[in-house]
Amino acid sequence: MVNIGGNIIALGQHGTQPWRVGIQHPRKPDAIATLDLPSGWAIGTSGDYQRYFELKGTRYCHIINPATGYPVQGVQSVTVLISPQPNAGVLSDVTSKPIFISQPDARAAMAKQMEVKDYLVIESDTKILASASMTKRLNWLDKQAEKHVVETH
């Protein structure tokens, strides 16, 4: 398994089992959920919780919306899962950011446009959007968060 910041690719297995990875809760020190990461699969997360500053009670993250020139607001994290294919690790990085930057009502369409089938979006209002296929893969550790999941197709 190779971990570079918010991106992980599985190379081989953990003994006879796939690697199990955690998805960071954007506002708590623990994982919000885990999932199995089989060999060749890659997972990438973009979020507002690693590199940011706060000014007058507002959080400003390092991801800039190119349409406005300002840091993205309204979303805490986006996690994508990419199936085995050439450059899966790179795709896990470059596909999470456009979904993160998209307007809330356009996130599912952006994922579909980029052919991302497995994604998880944690909005700032604690609403959680997840593709049906991603929902099936997740083992929720934060049961309160699980109650806020809205499945998208």
Q: Regions from the language model: what does each represent?
A:
Residues 1-153:
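Mature catalytic core of soluble alpha/beta enzymes
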